[in-house]
Every structure is written in structure tokens, then in C-alpha cells.
């Protein structure tokens, strides 16, 4: 690829996906003045299938397959993802090459009536499509009625405003990026709801043999975020985590030490397996795998085997 060719970003058409694509475009052009960057928009299966829970129709990979095909066929050079939506495995020839600085990784409590989970009345209806959020909500408040909630951020907020739910749970990062932070009644601390693996971080997937592109992307990589996300993903990879199972994790870096907390739960919140681990940042991925093995030994293995068998 010559220096003159534009960089083509494959992206979904949802407002948040377009925000992420423009974020990467702007960062590339700021780092490399004069570089041409184009957006190649496309619709994925995940954008089309809105009447079925993600866990039942193939999981998060539904949002990335078309983008990956475009890269493999040479119609696009890179794809920008919310890290929480990036599957464990990549097609041969593709991989995660850059992780950008993380936005707020917490879940957001959104309601027109109540300020937080504790204020919800008995039997309140809460909307989420995440088994991870569902199991933690049900553990804290078994009385709550959890209803499926699909669609992009604007669609979900409209369903709340139409009175279908007393509250909904979204990612803080998505609301902040779309300029909708005023809809966040309260951020849910990790102690109450562990976020998804990589939540709040933007990752860039590209062809592994594209050395020119990888060099262009180097200034966008944020080492601290990358270490945190790689630690969380190593844990998730060892658990073979996907949409079908409730897995939460959250990591922090303090100096040269990284700390990781994670959980695996029954969807109804009746059983929650939790653990944490800490060690040198240089061992981030090994620590993630270590914590996964700890969770598996503590009972997560049985939960995961049953849920995957039912999926």
C-alpha cells in the first residue's frame, strides 16, 4: 500500500459506531497531517436482528463479521470496535492492533423517575439485554422484573421515555460519547455492578500483515488502557466468555501493579462466583488467566458448562 492511498475505516451506521469511527479518523489525521481517511459504512446482522436476545442468535460477533469480511477482501483497512463487543477469536489474518484511551467503564443507571437502583420500588421493570447486568441486578434486588432491551442508544432511551421501563441500564461511555451524559441518573460503581470486559475502551482491528497501517496507528495506542483490557480479555478468553454467560470484570493500574476483579454468575443471580488478583503490570495477561482458573475451580466451571450446553 503506497503512502498516498487513503485509510479506509469499516464501520456500522449506528450513531455510537460512527462516533468511534470519526474519533479514530480525527486521531489519525491529527497524528499524520495530510493523511486521507475514509469511512466505509455497512449494516451488520446485529443491526438487523432486533427481536431476539443477542445470546440466542450468535452473540457479539454479529456486530463485527461483515466488517471483518470487508477487511479480508481488501474493501477496508481497519474496523473500530467497542472493546466489550469484540469476540474472543479473530479470523485468520486479522487481530487487535491498537487500544485507545478508556472512557468511564461503569454502567449507567438511567431513569426518568428514580435516582438509583436502591430507589426502585418492589417489582420495578428494568431494561437490559446484558446477562451480566441482569445477574448482578437480580442478586441485589431479586424482586426486580428484567425485560429485554435491544437497539441503539437512542432507541433504548425512547423505549424508556415511552414508559416501557422504570429504568434501563446502559454503558456510561456510550452516553458520554454521544453527548447524553445528562441522562445518567447515577453511575453504578464496580462494587455494585462489575462492567463488561473492556467496557469503555475503543479497539482497532486490522490485517496483521499491514505494517504501514500498524505504524500509522501506533500514536493512538494507550498503554495503560491496553494493559487493563488485555488483562480482562485474558480472563475472558480462558473462560471462553461470550454473550451466553454473565461475566463481569474490572481492572485498575497503580504504579507498576495491576489489580483485577471478576465474576461469573447464574443469570438469575442465585449463584455468584467472585475473585480478584493483583501483580506486576508486565504479567497482566498471565494474571487474567490465573484469575479465570481460580473462578473455574471455585464453581464457575459448572455454571459455564451448563449455560453453554443450553445455548
Swiss-Prot record:
Cofactor requirements of the protein: dipyrromethane
CDD domains the record matches: PBP2_EcHMBS_like
InterPro entries named among the record's database cross-references: HemC, Porphobilin_deaminase_cofac_BS, Porphobilin_deaminase_N, Porphobilinogen_deaminase_C, Porphobilinogen_deaminase_C_sf
Catalytic activity field: 4 porphobilinogen + H2O = hydroxymethylbilane + 4 NH4(+)
Modified residues (S-(dipyrrolylmethanemethyl)cysteine): 243
Pathway(s) it belongs to: Porphyrin-containing compound metabolism; protoporphyrin-IX biosynthesis; coproporphyrinogen-III from 5-aminolevulinate: step 2/4
Disulfide pairings: none
Cofactor note: Binds 1 dipyrromethane group covalently.
Keywords recorded for this protein, A-Z: Porphyrin biosynthesis, Transferase
PROSITE patterns: PORPHOBILINOGEN_DEAM
Cellular component aspect of the GO annotation: cytoplasm
GO-annotated biological processes: protoporphyrinogen IX biosynthetic process
Gene Ontology molecular function: hydroxymethylbilane synthase activity
Record EC number: 2.5.1.61
Main function: Tetrapolymerization of the monopyrrole PBG into the hydroxymethylbilane pre-uroporphyrinogen in several discrete steps.
Assembly and interaction partners: Monomer.
Other remarks in the entry: The porphobilinogen subunits are added to the dipyrromethane group.
Family indicated by similarity: Belongs to the HMBS family.
Protein name listed in UniProt: Porphobilinogen deaminase
Amino acid at each position: 500500500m503506497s503512502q498516498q492511498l487513503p485509510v479506509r475505516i469499516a464501520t456500522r451506521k449506528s450513531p455510537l459506531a460512527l462516533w468511534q469511527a470519526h474519533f479514530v479518523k480525527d486521531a489519525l489525521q491529527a497524528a499524520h497531517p495530510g493523511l486521507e481517511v475514509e469511512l466505509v459504512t455497512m449494516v451488520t446482522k446485529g443491526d438487523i436482528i432486533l427481536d431476539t436476545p443477542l445470546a440466542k442468535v450468535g452473540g457479539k460477533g454479529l456486530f463485527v463479521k461483515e466488517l471483518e469480511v470487508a477487511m479480508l477482501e481488501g474493501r477496508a483497512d481497519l474496523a473500530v470496535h467497542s472493546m466489550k463487543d469484540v469476540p474472543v477469536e479473530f479470523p485468520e489474518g486479522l487481530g487487535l492492533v491498537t487500544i485507545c484511551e478508556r472512557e468511564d467503564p461503569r454502567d449507567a443507571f438511567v431513569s426518568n423517575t428514580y435516582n438509583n437502583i436502591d430507589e426502585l420500588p418492589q417489582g420495578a421493570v428494568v431494561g437490559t439485554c446484558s446477562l451480566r447486568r441482569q445477574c448482578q441486578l437480580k442478586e441485589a434486588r431479586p424482586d426486580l422484573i428484567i425485560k429485554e432491551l435491544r437497539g441503539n442508544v437512542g432507541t433504548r432511551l425512547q423505549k424508556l421515555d415511552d414508559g416501557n421501563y422504570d429504568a434501563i441500564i446502559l454503558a456510561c461511555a456510550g452516553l458520554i460519547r454521544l453527548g447524553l451524559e445528562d441522562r445518567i441518573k447515577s453511575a453504578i460503581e464496580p462494587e455494585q455492578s462489575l462492567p463488561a470486559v473492556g467496557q469503555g475502551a475503543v479497539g482497532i482491528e486490522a490485517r496483521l500483515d499491514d505494517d504501514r497501517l500498524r505504524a500509522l496507528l501506533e500514536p493512538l495506542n494507550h498503554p495503560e488502557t491496553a494493559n487493563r483490557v488485555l488483562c480482562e480479555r485474558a480472563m475472558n478468553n480462558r473462560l471462553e466468555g461470550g454473550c451466553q454467560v454473565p461475566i463481569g470484570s474490572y481492572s485498575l493500574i497503580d504504579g507498576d501493579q495491576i489489580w483485577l476483579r471478576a465474576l461469573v454468575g447464574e443469570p438469575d443471580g442465585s449463584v455468584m462466583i467472585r475473585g480478584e488478583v493483583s501483580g506486576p503490570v508486565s504479567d497482566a495477561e498471565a494474571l487474567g488467566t490465573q484469575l479465570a482458573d481460580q473462578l473455574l475451580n471455585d464453581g464457575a466451571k459448572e455454571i459455564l458448562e451448563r449455560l453453554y450446553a443450553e445455548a
